[in-house]
């Protein structure tokens, strides 16, 4: 067990203030919140974490069935050894998976003692329904939201807002900031959003998110750090002064990366492209290559002074564990 892991209460055990003393004193201001069932939890906004440290964070997604929830929580539990400053949970595309998003978010807060950033999108819900989701999150002591428009339905290239719903992430941001006290993040795209006509127009939309209350930004995946560094430079020149956290997706297999980069509009550098071809039929070797590639990528980002790193873990712990073992970042490695 690492020193940082001792800051968390035992997985699945009731809240114990003594076990949280170190965590509570580490960063201020932290708010003690009473939630359903007479439980008390400690919460804080991620923007306050960013004022004190350079956070490492992990992103999870809800399973398709309720039976998959324990496996997601177990993966989260295993990664606590690396002392994540927060985790995020993506928003289900609809129906029951949305309730699974809330369930994982609440369980991470209650039983794992990890700060959580809940994803919320404009897809498939009216303003009133989204408001009700926000009220439930607030009642459970969740302090942080990442506000997203959401993707068009599979097979469609155009986003069509739900009747009575929000059309843009900025609309959702404005609603959250006007009605709640959440800390709010927004997404940004170092290589430009797939629907933007050019990088300057894309940056204008990012600036609107910040102007409407985004405390910090988290990037879409990228595999060439030059795109990130260029984006940050352009953002600063454009008056965007909030923290910009790079999002990193380690390669798990060749087909996965090619599929994700097509969907996101991210480019595959020639050197990585050759490696993906080399290991196209060997997932284990591709995964090991991905660990080394991401280790080098994150090391360069960290050494450049990024405010933190957000890992897209895809509900798997192996790759990100090895990456962090390689990097041994201060406060984010297991004891030998």
Predicted features along the sequence, with ranges:
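Active-site-adjacent beta->alpha loops and helix N-cap segments on the catalytic face
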Residues: 68-69, 95-107, 126-132, 152-176, ...
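N-terminal amphipathic alpha-helix/helix-capping segment at the start of soluble metabolic enzymes
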Residues: 40-58, 65, 174-175, 332-336
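Conserved, mostly hydrophobic/aromatic
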Residues: 59, 87, 137, 209, ...
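Glycine-rich, positively charged N-terminal anion/phosphate-binding segment
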Residues: 44-46, 69-77, 82, 94-114
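Active-site beta-loop-alpha junctions enriched in small/polar residues
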Residues: 60-63, 90-94, 119-125, 150-151, ...
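Active-site mouth loops of central-metabolism enzymes
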Residues: 56-71, 117-128, 185-201, 278-292
């Amino acid at each position: 067990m690492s020193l940082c892991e001792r800051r968390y209460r035992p997985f699945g055990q009731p809240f114990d203030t003594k076990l949280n003393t170190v965590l509570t004193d580490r960063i201020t201001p932290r708010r003690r919140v009473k939630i359903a069932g007479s439980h008390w939890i400690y919460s804080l906004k991620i923007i306050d974490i960013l004022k004190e440290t350079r956070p490492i964070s992990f992103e999870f997604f809800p399973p398709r069935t309720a039976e998959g929830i324990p496996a997601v929580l177990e993966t989260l539990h295993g990664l606590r050894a690396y002392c994540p400053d927060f985790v995020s949970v993506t928003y289900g595309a609809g129906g029951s998976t949305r309730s699974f998003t809330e369930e994982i978010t609440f369980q991470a807060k209650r039983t794992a003692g990890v700060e959580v950033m809940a994803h919320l999108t404009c897809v498939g819900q009216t303003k009133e329904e989204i408001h009700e989701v926000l009220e439930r999150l607030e009642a459970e002591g969740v302090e942080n939201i990442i506000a997203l428009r959401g993707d068009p339905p599979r097979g469609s290239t155009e986003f069509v807002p739900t009747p009575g719903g929000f059309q843009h992430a900025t609309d959702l941001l404005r609603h959250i900031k006007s009605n709640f006290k959440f800390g709010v993040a927004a997404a940004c795209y170092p290589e430009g959003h797939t629907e933007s006509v050019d990088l300057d127009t894309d940056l204008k939309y990012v600036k609107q998110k910040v102007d409407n209350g985004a405390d910090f930004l988290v990037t879409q995946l990228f595999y060439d750090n030059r795109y990130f560094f260029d984006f940050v430079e352009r953002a600063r020149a454009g008056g965007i002064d909030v923290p910009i956290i790079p999002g990193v997706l380690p390669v798990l297999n060749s087909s996965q990366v090619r599929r994700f980069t097509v969907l996101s509009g991210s480019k595959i550098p020639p050197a990585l492209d050759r490696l993906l071809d080399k290991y196209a039929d060997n997932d284990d070797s591709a995964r090991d290559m991905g660990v080394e590639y991401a280790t080098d990528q994150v090391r360069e980002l960290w050494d450049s002074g990024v405010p933190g790193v957000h890992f897209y873990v895809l509900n798997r712990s192996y790759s990100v564990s090895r990456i962090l073992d390689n990097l041994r970042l201060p406060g984010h490695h297991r004891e030998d």
